[in-house]
């Protein structure tokens, strides 16, 4: 999982999700979560049950699935054909297009579009939490 993009990206404040919100995805029992987050936000998950793989993971292909915001992680996992869930803003980068839940670029990507405004992240995360047990069944 990765919850934040490059802090220098012009749209980072919109496309990244605060760890405190994103961490609600890890409340599912019986599932191990691993952080693919790099940079200054990698330490956000310290003290949680999420295992940080920063500097340890040599191959994203070794993951079962990836949940991420719109970052390079999404594109790498998508290009590798990994099942990838990308949480995108209501007005995302052009690559994700509008009104789609899939990606024309990556066949294994599912898009979770934010409801309008930052207040929409909790609703988006709720949709992911509802779908996650189905994905793992």
Can you name each region flagged by the protein language model?
Residues 1-137:
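Catalytic machinery of carbohydrate-active enzymes
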């Amino acid at each position: 999982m990765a919850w934040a993009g490059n802090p220098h990206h012009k749209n980072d404040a919109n496309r990244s999700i605060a760890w405190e919100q994103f961490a609600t995805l890890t409340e599912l029992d019986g599932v191990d979560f691993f952080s693919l987050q790099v940079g200054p936000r990698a330490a956000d998950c310290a003290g949680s049950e999420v295992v940080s793989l920063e500097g340890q993971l040599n191959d994203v292909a070794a993951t079962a699935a990836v949940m991420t915001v719109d970052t390079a992680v999404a594109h790498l996992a998508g290009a590798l054909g990994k099942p990838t869930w990308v949480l995108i803003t209501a007005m995302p980068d052009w690559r994700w297009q509008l009104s789609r839940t899939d990606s024309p670029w990556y066949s294994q990507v599912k898009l979770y579009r934010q409801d309008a405004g930052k207040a929409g992240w909790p609703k988006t995360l709720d949709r992911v939490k509802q779908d996650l047990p189905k994905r793992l069944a």
